[in-house]
A protein has these predicted regions:
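Flexible loop residues that form catalytic
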Residues: 36, 71, 121, 212, ...
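Histidine-acidic metal/acid-base catalytic patches
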Residues: 1-8, 12-29, 50-53, 57-60, ...
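Flexible, glycine- and charge-enriched loops at secondary-structure boundaries
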Residues: 42-49, 87-94, 126-133, 193, ...
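Active-site acidic/histidine proton-transfer and metal-coordination neighborhood
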Residues: 13-17, 21-22, 58, 73-178
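Glycine-rich, proline-tolerant flexible connector loops at the mouths of alpha/beta enzymes
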Residues: 33-56, 121-124
Length: 278
């Protein structure tokens, strides 16, 4: 089964048409939507979301996933650290969260995708909340199932669940939940191994690809996939063997030359995933 390549148009800016045109030029037929027109996708009004879908349809592109910010939040009483939430608040009242879940499911429907990303609460010391025991999660999973959507948990280091053991714990506790596996994040927490990938593969429904070179000051220099420290040449074949046919989404974070990074990343993926990518 051949895997697919996914491109996020907002890597090239807030006019989604620009990124979609690059996708076409690269032979990429699937999109991930996170932000557009200066707003998080969940904050866009229905007409703006429909416009994104129309632009994709006009080019023969399909939205593979909605990269929502659900659960990348904490309570208003907590103080989050520096977090990139892509235009969405990091402090959300408990009473508002159900509405955001419903909005994400609605946006996914408007975009025509069945995959919606979620996180696991920001880590904020003693005020950190638990996703595994969050009563909102069973509600969200049932609402998603009714809508024909699957919620996929990303392993995010600034959130509570980033390592294989904790990922497996919550995925097994909530069978409707899938995994949005970020291999760069897995490497960041010291778990970028073939063994970890093989353990997580049965739950994986979507894959994020980004690469970087660690700096002496603890920061990262993001680079095109295949040119950094993440051991993709070992991880990608192992994941494909265990779980063929997955979507692989390029998330470069390369600010200066995003088009070049996406082009090189797409070439690398096609050369490294056995059988190539569509």
């Amino acid at each position: 089964m051949q895997a697919i390549t996914v491109l996020n148009p907002d890597e090239l800016g807030q006019d989604p048409a620009v990124g979609m045109d690059l996708a076409l030029a690269l032979g990429v037929r699937h999109l991930e939507i996170r932000t557009a027109y200066g707003s998080n996708a969940l904050v866009l009004d229905d007409e703006q979301v429909r416009r994104v879908r129309q632009l994709a349809d006009e080019r023969g592109l399909r939205v593979a996933a909605l990269a929502s910010p659900l659960w990348k939040w904490c309570s208003p009483e907590a103080t989050p650290g520096r977090v990139d939430s892509f235009g969405f608040p990091t402090q959300v009242h408990a009473g508002d969260r159900e509405r955001w879940v419903e909005r994400a499911i609605t946006v996914a429907g408007l975009l025509g995708t069945e995959r919606v990303r979620v996180f696991s609460h920001l880590s904020v010391g003693e005020q950190t909340e638990s996703l595994r025991d969050d009563p909102l999660l069973p509600y969200a999973l049932k609402a998603a199932e009714r809508a024909g959507v699957q919620l996929l948990l990303e392993n995010e280091p600034v959130c509570t669940i980033a390592e294989p053991a904790s990922l497996l714990d919550v995925l097994q506790a909530h069978p409707g939940l899938g995994l949005w596996l970020d291999l760069g994040n897995l490497f960041e927490v010291g778990q970028g191994t073939v063994e970890a990938v093989e353990a997580l593969a049965p739950y994986t429904e979507y894959v994020h690809i980004k690469d970087y070179r660690p700096r002496d000051d603890g920061m990262k220099d993001f680079v095109a996939a295949g040119t950094g420290a993440v051991p993709y040449r070992e991880l990608l074949p192992a994941l494909h063997r265990a779980r063929p046919g997955l979507p692989y989404a390029l998330e470069t974070h390369v600010r200066a030359t995003p088009g070049e990074a996406l082009t090189l990343g797409a070439e690398f993926l096609r050369a490294t995933v056995p059988g190539g990518l569509a």
